From Swiss-Prot:
NCBIfam families: PRK00984.1-2. Residues 161-312 form the TRUD domain. This is tRNA pseudouridine synthase D. It catalyses: uridine(13) in tRNA = pseudouridine(13) in tRNA. The gene is truD.
C-alpha cells in the first residue's frame, strides 16, 4: 500500500499541490461542526433526541454517558456518525427510554465540555448516516502563502467541486486501521467486537475507493463520465449506467445533476461497464485479497460519487489573526479535510493529523 511518512495514502490533487501552510485546531473553536438533519422531529414518541454541543469530547464516550444517565443499553443510544474529537461539535443523539422516567438532562450532562442545546421527542432512533450534511467553520492559524493563489483554488472548488476522497480519519493513526485490515485478510485473527469490525471494513472499502479516484484524478477524468459509467444522482444514493456518453448526458454532469462514481467494494457484480469497469479492475488488480475479504465479510457492491460539491463556500483572511477562515457545507459522508488538502498544507496543533473519535 502506497503511503507517505505519516502513513497516509499518496493521492493525486484535483489542482496544483498546495504550497500555502497553516496550523489547524490550535483551539477547539478553530474546528466547528454543526449537524443538519434531513427531516423534522415530531415532538412525540419514546425516543428522546438531544442536540448537544461537545468540546474536545469523544462521540462514543458521550453516547456511553447518555446510556448510563438514562439507565439503558448502549445500543439504545443513536447518533448519525463519529465526529472529530478535537473541536467544537454540535451533534444529535437519541435515547430510547421505552417508558423509563426521563432524566434531567441539563443537570446530568452540563459541564465544561458538554452543553445541552435542545431536547425533543421522536418516534424513531437516530440511525447511522441519517444526516443531510454538516456545516463547518474552520480557522487555520499562522497562515503563510500566496493569498491570491489560495483564493483562485477556492474559487475553482466553489464552482466545480473537488475529488471526494475519504479523509485520513477513516484509516486511523498513521494508517494503522489498514495494517489491521491487511493482517486480518491475510489469515490473521478477525477483529473482536462489531464496532472494530465495522471500522476496519469501512477503512478497507475507503482505501480501494481512494485508489480508483486518485487514478482518475491523475487521468483528469474524475469529473467526466466514461463509457459504462455508473452515474450517481445528485443528493441521493441512486445511480444509472450510461453505456454511451452523449452531449445531453455531459450537460447533465456539467449542471451537477449527476456525478461519476467509484466502487465501495462488496459482493456482486460491479454496475460499472465498459471503459469505467476496465479502469477500476486495472487499478484494483493488486488488491484481490482485500476485495475477497470484503466480499466474504458480506458487504454488497455500492457506489460513491467521485466529485464532492462544496456548498456555501466562503472564506476570509482576518488580519488580526494572521489566519484563513473557511465556512462551508458538505453532504453526509464527506470530509472537511478533503477540502482543506486541496488548498493548504495543514499541521495539527493538537498532535496527530485529523483524528476521529476512536
Amino acid at each position: 500500500m502506497e503511503a507517505d511518512e505519516a502513513g497516509q495514502q499518496v493521492l493525486a490533487y484535483g489542482g496544483d499541490p498546495p504550497l500555502a501552510t497553516a496550523l489547524l485546531r490550535c483551539r477547539p473553536e478553530d474546528f466547528q461542526v454543526v449537524e443538519e438533519l434531513p427531516f423534522a422531529l415530531s415532538g412525540e414518541g419514546e425516543h428522546v433526541w438531544l442536540l448537544l454541543c461537545k468540546r474536545n469530547t469523544n462521540t462514543v464516550w458521550l453516547a456511553r454517558q447518555l446510556a448510563r444517565i438514562a439507565g439503558v443499553r448502549l445500543v439504545d443510544v443513536g447518533y448519525a456518525g463519529l465526529k472529530d474529537r478535537h473541536g467544537l461539535t454540535t451533534q444529535w443523539f437519541s435515547v430510547n427510554l421505552s417508558g423509563k422516567k426521563e432524566p434531567a438532562w441539563a443537570t446530568a450532562l452540563e459541564s465544561a465540555t458538554v452543553q445541552v442545546l435542545k431536547v425533543i421527542r421522536h418516534s424513531r432512533k437516530l440511525q447511522r448516516g441519517a444526516l443531510k450534511g454538516n456545516r463547518f467553520l474552520l480557522t487555520l492559524r499562522h497562515f503563510q502563502g500566496d493569498r491570491e493563489v489560495v483564493c483562485d483554488r477556492l474559487t475553482q472548488i466553489k464552482v466545480a467541486g473537488t475529488p471526494n476522497y475519504f479523509g485520513p480519519q477513516r484509516f486511523g493513526r498513521g494508517g494503522q486501521n489498514l495494517d489491521q485490515v491487511h493482517r486480518w485478510f491475510s489469515g490473521g485473527k478477525p477483529p473482536r467486537g462489531r464496532y472494530l469490525r465495522g471500522m476496519l471494513l469501512s477503512a478497507a472499502r475507503a482505501f480501494l475507493f481512494n485508489r480508483v479516484l486518485s487514478e482518475r484524478v491523475q487521468a483528469a477524468n474524475w469529473w467526466q463520465p466514461l463509457p459504462g459509467e455508473a452515474l450517481i444522482l445528485d443528493g441521493s444514493h441512486g445511480f444509472f449506467v450510461a453505456e454511451t456518453i452523449d452531449e445531453a448526458l455531459q450537460a447533465r454532469v456539467r449542471r451537477f445533476d449527476c456525478h461519476p462514481s467509484g466502487p465501495l467494494w462488496g459482493r456482486g457484480e460491479s454496475p460499472a461497464k465498459r471503459m469505467s469497469r476496465a479502469l477500476e479492475e486495472e487499478v484494483l488488480a493488486d488488491y484481490a485479497l482485500w476485495r475477497e475479504g470484503l466480499e466474504q465479510a458480506g458487504l454488497k457492491q455500492e457506489r460513491r460519487s467521485l466529485r464532492l460539491m462544496v456548498a456555501d463556500l466562503e472564506w476570509s483572511f482576518p488580519p488580526a489573526m494572521d489566519s484563513l477562515q473557511l465556512h462551508f457545507r458538505l453532504p453526509a459522508g464527506a470530509y472537511a479535510t478533503t477540502v482543506l488538502r486541496e488548498v493548504v498544507r495543514t499541521q495539527e496543533a493538537v498532535g496527530q493529523p485529523f483524528l476521529l473519535d476512536e
